[in-house]
Amino acid sequence: MFKMVSSPHTHSSNLTAKFMLWVMVAMLPALGMQAYFFGYGVFIQVFIALLLAVAIEIAIAKLRRKLTAFYVADLSGVLTALILAISIPPYAPYWIIVIGIIVALLLAKHSYGGLGQNLFNPAMVAYALLLVSFPVQMTGWLVPIDLLNEPPTFGDAISLVFSGVTSDGFSVHQLLGSVDGIAQATPLDSAKTSMQKLGVEGVLQSPIFSGLFANGWWQINLAFLAGGLLLIYKRIIHWQIPAAMLGMFALLSGLTDLLLPHTHLNVVSQLFSGAMMFGAFFIATDPVTASITPRGKLIFGGLIGLFVYLIRYYGNYPDAVAFSVLLANICVPLIDHYTQPRLYGTGR
């Protein structure tokens, strides 16, 4: 006699915790690269974010009278915290990451019912709210430390995060102002503010763009690319979303270069600046808020690439990945509705 059980009859070994853990492992090279170029502040932000995220998950479990392991062991809150911590400036005030984690987990995740119920990517909801509400703190990126006359020590990093100044009394913006030829701290910020004055060639010759790999930003994006390819190889994420996102952006950016030369950064510089690779492989591929159908994934990724192009080239925000992901999240129910695979034996 065979015991009759309901489907599913086969089970995937990709449990939620395993999925989250692999994503975090794939982020470690980029995290290390970011810390190498921007200093100890990266680790301080990550520590605060992870500590608060675990505390919130435990508190929510107790409020809902669930087992603590039910909320903590799936690592979803930890991954959200890590993504947000990497996204914000390393020397942003501590209360920035505190507000961000509270918004991400309480407002954008648990207010919808918890893991699997949220409509929008929690980390990007928090990032977008922080960017709109605290633009000065959220644009306080230091240049790579090899461009600074006196890179912050570990003590300076702690002081900057918790008091806003180094032990010598310098703020982040004062440290940034000590580097000649840099208007803003990231390549995209610098290009956005300096393009009309200096032109493309002048921008590319500035300190933040000089050198083979643009002083750290290329290496960070290459590390995210390598981690993303690992996730595709391990079948943790699908290739359609990052391929469609990067392909759409590269296509539109390339056409702009052909039709309007010398008006924007070239395609390669755009692809390897800001959060492009991070967004393509680690943010847009969130299994809860992304499209679930094969064709839908391509459309979803293409939409993100389109939105990033429009905002970067014609909007006020130089990076645009967070806003683009959130805009595409809105379209997911419609995309999934019209891209459902046809059942065998049924009409179109």
UniProtKB/Swiss-Prot annotation:
Q: What is its EC number?
A: 7.-.-.-
Localization, per the record, is:
Cell inner membrane
**What membrane topology is annotated for this entry?**
Multi-pass membrane protein
GO cellular component term of the entry, any: plasma membrane
- The reply on keyword 4Fe-4S is no
Per UniProt, which keywords does this protein have?
Answer: Cell inner membrane, Cell membrane, Electron transport, Flavoprotein, FMN, Membrane, Phosphoprotein, Translocase, Transmembrane, Transmembrane helix, Transport
Q: Where are the transmembrane segments?
A: 15-35, 36-56, 67-87, 88-108, 125-145, 212-232, 241-261, 265-285, 298-318, 320-340
Main location as per UniProt:
membrane
Q: FMN phosphoryl threonine is carried by which residues?
A: 186
Q: Which GO terms describe its biological process?
A: electron transport chain; transmembrane transport
Record keyword Cell inner membrane present = yes
**Top EC class for this record:** translocase
Cofactors needed by this protein, per the record, are: FMN
What this protein is reported to do is described as: Part of a membrane-bound complex that couples electron transfer with translocation of ions across the membrane.
Annotated family: Belongs to the NqrB/RnfD family.
Quaternary context: The complex is composed of six subunits: RnfA, RnfB, RnfC, RnfD, RnfE and RnfG.
Annotated protein name in UniProt: Ion-translocating oxidoreductase complex subunit D
